Amino acid sequence: MKFRPCIDIHNGSVKQIVGGTLSDRGNQAEDNFVSEYDAAFYANMYREDGLTGGHIILLNKADSEYYEADLAQAKEALTAFPRGLQIGGGVNLQNAESFLDMQASHVIVTSFVFRDGRIDWDHLKQLISLVGREHLVLDLSCRFVQDDYYIVTDRWQKVTKQHFSV
């Protein structure tokens, strides 16, 4: 078994939110835990403990008043653990390379590769061409709806038409 650490950043703080409570309206989420430490603290701890393959998730939208604070936290964490963490949250063609330039090992993407509830293969191919498949993680987070699991996008708020049977 391998432990994969996570740093979730919302409204400029490292926190754990209650699943399904994230809302773009008012940048709100129900907090389960808000850390007194910054993202760099956790990145340093993960580096010192040899915990690779972890990720940072920016939970605010890019047009949120808190996005720059989220991004500043992420930059500090990536500086503390260069190439040791992946990053996701609003990744697209305009910013994917900048995250890798900030020393992320990979970019994590979901919403950008979906359009009208379906996988947009052109967007996926463009992203692969831009950053290389070796630096790309496709997050297929799912939610159970009726009798099946469906991929969710846009900070787990939008259920797509793409389902998985189990």
Please provide the spans of the model-predicted regions.
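Alpha-helix-loop-beta-strand connector modules within alpha/beta enzyme cores
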Residues: 64-86, 124-141
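Short catalytic helix/loop segments, enriched in acidic residues and glycine
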Residues: 20-44
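Glycine-rich, proline-tolerant flexible connector loops at the mouths of alpha/beta enzymes
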Residues: 51-72, 111-118
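Hydrophobic faces of well-ordered beta-strands that scaffold small-molecule active sites
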Residues: 2-10, 54-56, 83-89, 107-109, ...
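Non-catalytic positions within long, well-ordered alpha-helices that form the structural scaffold/packing
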Residues: 47-50, 100-101
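Catalytic cores of alpha/beta
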Residues: 73-106
